[in-house]
Amino acid sequence: MKPSFRRKARACALQVLYSWEISHNNIKESAIYFLKEKNKKNIDIVYFYELIIGITYDCKNIDNLMKPYLFRSLKELGHIERAILRISFYELHKRNDIPYKVSINEGIELAKLFGSEDSHKFINGVLDKAVFKMGYNKKVVIA
C-alpha cells in the first residue's frame, strides 16, 4: 500500500524538525530547502507546513504535554523520538479531526522508518499512556 500524502507530510516534517533542532536554522528556510529536494506531488504540503509551523510555534506547550508520560527527561530523548512525539502530541492536542488511533499509528510508523530498533515500542508506550490518561480515547468527534 502506498503511503498517503499526509503520511509523507509527517515524514518530511519529521526530517525538517530534526534538522531544525540540531542546526537551529530558521524553520521556514529549512522547509523550503528540504522541499526543493523532494517530489512535492506526493506530499500534503499544507499539512507539512501546518506541522512544522504549529510545532515550532507551540513547542514548549507541546513538550509540557508530553513530560508527564515520559520516564526520562526530554533532553535524554533522541532527536528523532522527540520530533515524532511532538508531531503525535500536536495532532492529539490540536487536530480533533484526526482520530487518536491514527495519530498513534502514524507515530509508530515514523519510528519504524526513522528511529532506532526499539523506538516504535517506546513511542507506542508513551502515546498509549497519554491517550488513556488524557481521555483522548473517550473523545467523540462529530464531523
Curated annotation (Swiss-Prot):
Keywords for this protein: RNA-binding, Transcription, Transcription antitermination, Transcription regulation
InterPro entries, per database record: NusB-like_sf (IPR035926), NusB_fam (IPR011605), NusB_RsmB_TIM44 (IPR006027)
Superkingdom as given in the UniProt entry: Bacteria
GO terms under biological process: DNA-templated transcription termination; transcription antitermination
GO MF, any single term: RNA binding
Presence of keyword Transcription: yes
Pfam families referenced in this protein's UniProt entry, alphabetically: NusB
Gene Ontology cellular-component terms listed: cytosol
Function: Involved in transcription antitermination. Required for transcription of ribosomal RNA (rRNA) genes. Binds specifically to the boxA antiterminator sequence of the ribosomal RNA (rrn) operons.
HAMAP family: NusB
Family according to the record: Belongs to the NusB family.
PANTHER family in the record: ANTITERMINATION NUSB DOMAIN-CONTAINING PROTEIN (PTHR11078:SF3), N UTILIZATION SUBSTANCE PROTEIN B-RELATED (PTHR11078)
Full protein name: Transcription antitermination protein NusB
